[in-house]
Amino acid sequence: MVFMALGLVFTIQNVCSGQSKIDYTNIHPLRWMDPYRNPITYQEYTSSREFAPGLDARLIYTGNKGNVNICIIINASLQLQIQTKFSVFLADLQADGYNPNVYTANNDGDEGALKNLLISEWNSRQIVGTIMIGDLAVPWYEMNEPESWGGAHVEFPIDLYFMDLDGLWTDADSDGMYDDHQDGVGDMEADIWMGRLLAMNLTYHGATERALMDNYFDKNHRYRTGDLRLQDKALAYIDNDWCIYGWEYEVAMAYPQTDPVIDVYQTNREDYMQRVRQSTDNQYENLLICSHSSPWAHYLYWGTGPYDYSLFYNYEIEEIDVQVLFYNLFACSNSRYVEDDDMGDWYIFQTTYGLISLGSSKTGSMLCFYDYYTPLGNGANFGEAFLSWCIDDIETCAGDESRAWFYGMTLLGDPTLKLSRFLPDPTGDVNRDGIIDINDVVYLVNYLYKGGPVPDPLRLGDVTEDCTVNVSDVLFLINYLFKSGPPPGVGCA
């Protein structure tokens, strides 16, 4: 199979042969870069919170329209605020074949009680995944980094705890943080996928948790129905320390059109902003960014000097309207969701774009990318692709340093989403290129008045949902594209 990207020919053979030569125990590690702030500790986190007296988990909805069982747990008070948009999300999930049990719960600080609920669902209904929404208990892990990394003691949230339902997690010093993970009644592999939606600690731009959640579910629905689509291509933006490894070829296993940016004199703040901002309109559906970072900024090299950094900040995501839907953040602690205004969450809760970010809550990120991008490119949803990667790589990819690299990995967003090429063509995308634009108007005009080809299927041109394709559909599409009119309907012609 041949992939094309920027005039380069990518072949599966080249990708695989290149991988065999990479020593993942010798990859330049990511670093915490912020000189003024340190990661919040477990003690600081717990002492700053007021926990509920109990979990009080209540089953409020049982789906019966799908055949793939999942479990959704949502903060009880948040559910009351967002139930209108959340109900649309549930309908979308069931239309895609999922059968959700929905529970409301409180954050009582007891991650074990939350996990027991998942274990019960796994044993009784064989759930394949879970989505946690809002303020819920967070599991923490502690470890010493490898000596080659400096040997520091680190504490971090670990969502793998909720994915492995039959392993053994122990807290030898009884300080509230797990410090070991082994086989239990079953193995220590991840058993289910997990996604987390948490917006309560995002504070910029007048943000409120309710508004951010409502907007996220609105974006989610628009993506599923075809109203929010970008082009079927990816950007691999790889800074100096990792530009030699060919990771852009691994992204190409999901996106045949992958644009690599790996020149050490090119990867910097200004160039990154120019490529991803909406006004440039590159329309990348997916982004891999590899950059030394903190939860609040990317530290991109400026040239080749060891300390010549140019920073892209969390608050700028909204300001420049970053035009990407799906992120892989090879960026130290960028998804440390216990910190206020972490970038992993801002990338998905920005107003216009953003649906999923995959990143780490600690120093480290993903390696062995091909085990993630290959299933994505074969039609798996993001949760399935992440679960597959966890099973294959989380304990082994980097040898003895694997836990240091990977135990902070977390998926923020809705894991049931897939790449747009695996979704139905949206009504209005008459030429079936994945986006609705002026070219579709031209296509309809040519069909109606110049003997051009018939839309296939015809419903793609029936944007007014009157079961015919005529000049009204042309006018409707123009109004939608250029006058902020309503989006196209489903179509029935």
Regions found by a protein language model. Give the residues of each.
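Cellulosome-associated attachment modules in secreted, modular CAZymes
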Residues: 422-493
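Residue-level detector of transmembrane insertion/anchoring sites
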Residues: 3-4, 404, 456
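Serine/threonine-rich, low-complexity intrinsically disordered segments
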Residues: 13-14, 466
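Cysteine-dependent hydrolase recognition
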Residues: 18-422
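Bacterial N-terminal signal peptides
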Residues: 2-13
